[in-house]
């Protein structure tokens, strides 16, 4: 029991000890030792802009080597170079002001570890509540200090049961660490859901010298938020100077944003409109092609119709000509028949007339012969008459005979 009383008496003395002095301010320290060479390069009459000191918070104008305006140096060819060195090559200055990333919305300004312990004690004296400053580093460091102090006092005060007390302290420390981890996670969750409107608690923290970054949600952030209980032991090992610089304006670094539903919807609408436009263009081209083919077919139909009409007219004309020729032929045939009939009739009349004339001549001849034999004749002439009558009979026989019968008789 004496050991525990000694521990309780020693704790406030150790924790209430004044913090060590802070690190000296390096805002006035000169960074570039070759300032004389730079003045010789630019000339004494050129007004040089103020340089950038990495120990000072961002917001001042950058160094002339990197981001200065073009100097009035006349190069032999071309325009002067805007920068002598590549960005981040020689002088590792930040291109944008350091700001709190929206991926870790509960990030606050961190001061040195000793100052944080003193501020935590002051805040506990005001409202008897432990505040989570930064990402839970102060609470975890306080618990570790208490555990180490209790272990040291127990080992110094007890000679026979030091091993048992140290084991019990280690078990208690592990239990306390397990109990503190959910509380720290809950505090982080509460801080991430804080609104943009500043609270009076934040004003009191600003008065005490603690700068709390206001969380602002710009959209869906890609990345995993690490809980403070996972990184508390690592952050205790880091140097406090790495977390001392914070953005005065509370700017945010650009983070990778996931495409919103509206962007995806707009992209789908754009693709749909492109497909519709291509379909309309193809339909218009096919319609124009079909229209051109229809016009060509209409022209062909018109030409063929005109040619058909011309052929029909020619056929009608030839038909009329053929009918006319047929009529002329029939008329000529009739004329020829009539002419042949008339000729045949004329030939028959001529033959009859000739026959009649021949019969008359023969009759006249016979009559003359008869008349000549009926005159006066004597006895001497009686013999001659008989002879002539015989010859006259033969002549009548010859004249009366038909030529056909003669031919038959001769044959």
UniProtKB/Swiss-Prot annotation:
User: Region annotation Disordered: residue ranges?
Assistant: 1-30, 130-197, 232-293, 346-411
Q: Where is this region: Basic motif?
A: 271-290
Q: Which Pfam families match?
A: bZIP_1 (PF00170), MFMR (PF07777), MFMR_assoc (PF16596)
Which gene underlies this protein?
Answer: CPRF1
One GO MF term attached to the UniProt entry: DNA-binding transcription factor activity
Regions of biased composition (Polar residues) lie at: 148-164, 249-259
Protein's UniProt name: Common plant regulatory factor 1
State the compartments where it is located: Nucleus
* InterPro entries assigned to the protein according to its UniProt record, in alphabetical order: bZIP (IPR004827), bZIP_plant_GBF1 (IPR045314), bZIP_sf (IPR046347), GBF-like (IPR044827), MFMR (IPR012900)
| Annotated Gene Ontology cellular component terms | nucleus
User: What triggers production of this protein?
Assistant: By light.
Q: What family is it from?
A: Belongs to the bZIP family.
Q: What highest taxon heads this organism's lineage? A: Eukaryota
* bZIP domain mapped to chain residues: 269-332
> Transcription regulation as a keyword?
yes
Q: What is its main location?
A: nucleus
Subunit and partners? Binds DNA as a dimer.
List keywords of the entry alphabetically.
DNA-binding, Nucleus, Transcription, Transcription regulation
User: Basic and acidic residues bias located where?
Assistant: 1-14, 235-244, 264-293
């Amino acid at each position: 029991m004496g050991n525990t009383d000694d521990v309780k008496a020693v704790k406030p003395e150790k924790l209430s000890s004044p913090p060590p002095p802070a690190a000296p301010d390096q805002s006035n320290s000169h960074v570039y030792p070759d300032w004389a060479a730079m003045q010789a390069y630019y000339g004494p009459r050129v007004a040089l802009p103020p340089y950038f000191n990495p120990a000072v918070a961002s917001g001042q104008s950058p160094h002339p080597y990197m981001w200065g305006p073009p100097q009035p140096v006349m190069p032999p060819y071309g325009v002067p170079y805007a920068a002598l060195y590549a960005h981040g090559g020689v002088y590792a200055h930040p291109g944008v002001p350091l700001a709190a990333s929206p991926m870790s919305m509960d990030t606050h300004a961190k001061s040195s570890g000793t100052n944080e312990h003193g501020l935590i004690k002051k805040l506990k004296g005001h409202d008897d509540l432990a505040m989570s400053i930064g990402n839970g580093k102060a609470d975890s460091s306080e618990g570790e200090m208490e555990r180490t102090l209790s272990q040291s006092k127990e080992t110094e005060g007890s000679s026979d049961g030091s091993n048992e007390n140290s084991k019990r302290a280690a078990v208690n420390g592990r239990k306390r660490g397990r109990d503190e981890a959910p509380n720290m996670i809950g505090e982080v969750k509460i801080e991430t859901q804080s609104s943009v409107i500043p609270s009076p608690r934040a004003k009191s923290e600003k008065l005490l010298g603690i700068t709390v970054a206001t969380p602002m949600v710009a959209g869906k952030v890609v990345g995993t938020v690490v809980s403070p209980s996972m990184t508390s032991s690592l952050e205790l090992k880091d140097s406090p100077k790495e977390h001392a610089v914070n953005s005065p304006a509370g700017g945010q670094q650009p983070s990778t944003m996931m495409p919103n539903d509206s962007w995806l919807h707009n992209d789908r609408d754009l693709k749909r409109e492109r497909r519709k436009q291509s379909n309309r263009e193809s339909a218009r081209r096919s319609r124009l092609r079909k229209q051109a083919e229809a016009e060509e077919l209409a022209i062909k139909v018109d030409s063929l119709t005109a040619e058909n009409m011309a052929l029909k007219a020619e056929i009608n004309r030839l038909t009329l000509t053929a009918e006319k020729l047929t009529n002329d032929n029939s008329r000529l045939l009739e004329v020829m028949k009539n002419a042949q009939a008339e000729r045949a009739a004329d030939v028959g009349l001529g033959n009859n007339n000739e026959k009649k004339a021949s019969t008359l001549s023969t009759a006249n001849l016979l009559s003359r012969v008869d008349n000549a034999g009926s005159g006066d004749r004597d006895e001497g002439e009686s013999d001659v008459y008989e002879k002539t009558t015989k010859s006259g009979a033969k002549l009548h026989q010859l004249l009366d005979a038909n030529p056909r019968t003669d031919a038959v008789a001769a044959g």
